[in-house]
Amino acid sequence: DLTHEDKMIRKYQRKLNRQKYMSNNYKKTLQKYYKWLNRKNNKIQNAYHQLSKYIVKNYDIIAMEDLNIKGMFKNKRWAPKLQKISLYKLVQMIKYKSKWYEKTFIQINRFYPSSQICSECGYQKHDLTIDIREWTCPSCKTKHNRDINAAKNILQKALQEL
């Protein structure tokens, strides 16, 4: 939880704005501001390292989709949420840690229609838009959650590539 760090960063930003530029008090406040900024960044880095280590240590095969992060930033709804996290950094950590621990890391192409393909029968529903979160396969009548179905398909694709 980074609420305390965010609160302190905002506090020192306001304080810096009120002080005379490059005065002694300004320099002291600037040091405190950077201290809290570093503390926040260290907590984030630590969380990424813990998560990536957990994933790599507990799974022998790690399959991830190569996400179009630049395209996600163009979406007005997702951009503010994505600015707070660094998916690229997390993926890079998982990649190099999987080499350290001699685990298999497979990255699936971003254009693979993982959420459009039924994980039960293989039917591909082409008219599936991004706002549809659940859908029923017309072929086998299986009800799918978009994200869970995509995860199953990514795993199947990774196992095929082995």
Provide a role label for each language-model segment:
Residues 1-162:
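Positively charged, helix-rich recognition surfaces that bind polyanionic ligands
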